[in-house]
């Protein structure tokens, strides 16, 4: 069952690339986000069923490269092409992003297995891919005014550097481990999503998570 969920994420990634090729960027972004939800589900299902394995870990990493490395890069590249940005800059930013994602996954797979998964070294490739997809979706919803087009290459490179960095991020599962935090967070997100828009709320939450790791690292250096 967990492997079927993982392969479903790969289907989402392939569909996203095809949709980008056909100019359906909004649907492509939605497919990447669907892959993100599936990626969050497969590991938990494997642990719940007691079938977690090294094979599952390697399979998940390979699928992550496509779902959150290749697909978001292709999406951003195609989104920025008509927006008066030099193709070489877009290409370089997207390549940096994919390299950062592959590096992050390779390093993660070499780390010794630990009983606690409360933190991760470097921003996860899944969160990075979801962030890029959300940025594109939100910008298209708000007529390209939410995030300046000129900032997209820099944002893409920053995410690449965060993935390759040693900045520690709390695992999302540990953040919502306490029941009251989970219920309060879901309730607040649901209210905001109804009031504003689902992708914008998701983008704000993801952006806050990315910024939290940076702020905590900066605080640790200045202490």
Mark where each language-model region is.
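Hydrophobic, well-structured mid-protein blocks that either form specific transmembrane helices
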Residues: 88-131
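C-terminal membrane-associated helical module and adjoining short loops/tails
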Residues: 117-223
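Topogenic membrane-insertion module of multi-pass membrane proteins
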Residues: 1-40, 216
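Multi-pass membrane catalytic core of lipid/isoprenoid biosynthesis enzymes
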Residues: 1-7, 48-106
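C-terminal ends of transmembrane helices
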Residues: 42-53, 102-117, 164-172, 214-221
């Amino acid at each position: 069952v967990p492997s079927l969920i993982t392969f479903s994420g790969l289907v989402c990634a392939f569909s996203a690339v095809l949709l980008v090729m056909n100019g359906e960027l909004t649907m492509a972004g939605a497919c990447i986000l669907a892959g993100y939800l599936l990626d969050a589900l497969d590991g938990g299902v494997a642990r719940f069923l007691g079938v977690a394995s090294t094979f599952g870990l390697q399979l998940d990493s390979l699928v992550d490269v496509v779902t959150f490395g290749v697909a978001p890069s292709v999406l951003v590249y195609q989104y920025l092409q008509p927006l008066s940005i030099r193709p070489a800059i877009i290409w370089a930013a997207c390549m940096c992003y994919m390299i950062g994602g592959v590096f992050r996954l390779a390093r993660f797979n070499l780390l010794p297995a630990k009983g606690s998964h409360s933190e991760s070294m470097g921003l996860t490739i899944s969160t990075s891919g979801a962030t890029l997809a959300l940025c594109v979706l939100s910008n298209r919803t708000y007529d390209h005014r939410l995030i300046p087009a000129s900032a997209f290459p820099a944002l893409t490179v920053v995410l690449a550097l965060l993935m390759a960095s040693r900045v520690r991020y709390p695992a999302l599962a540990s953040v919502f481990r306490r029941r009251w935090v989970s219920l309060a967070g879901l309730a607040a997100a649901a209210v905001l999503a109804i009031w504003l828009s689902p992708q914008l709320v998701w983008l704000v939450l993801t952006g806050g998570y990315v910024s939290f790791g940076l702020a905590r690292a900066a605080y640790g250096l200045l202490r």
